[in-house]
Design a protein with these regions (language model features):
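Positively charged, low-complexity terminal tracts
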Residues: 1-71
């Protein structure tokens, strides 16, 4: 049995997509994964990533956001 813990829920203002981040922990131990669930109307996109990929993705998102006009 795996344990799923909700970390954050967001809604994109332009497209209305629902984004949920979840931590996935496996009973046998090992590496936890970050599950990203994106719901767009009745369609779901779900993928699991490792901590290193999550860190690189997060840094890329922050770099992009920091380069955008504020206001």
């Amino acid at each position: 049995m795996t344990r799923t813990t909700s970390l954050a829920k967001l809604r994109a203002p332009l497209g209305g997509q629902e984004i949920e981040l979840q931590q996935i922990d496996f009973d046998g131990g090992g590496m936890s994964l970050l599950r990203t669930r994106i719901r767009e109307k009745s369609r779901f996109t779900v993928f699991d990533i490792d901590p290193q990929t999550a860190e690189a993705w997060g840094q890329a998102l922050l770099r992009w956001a920091d380069g955008q006009p504020k206001g």
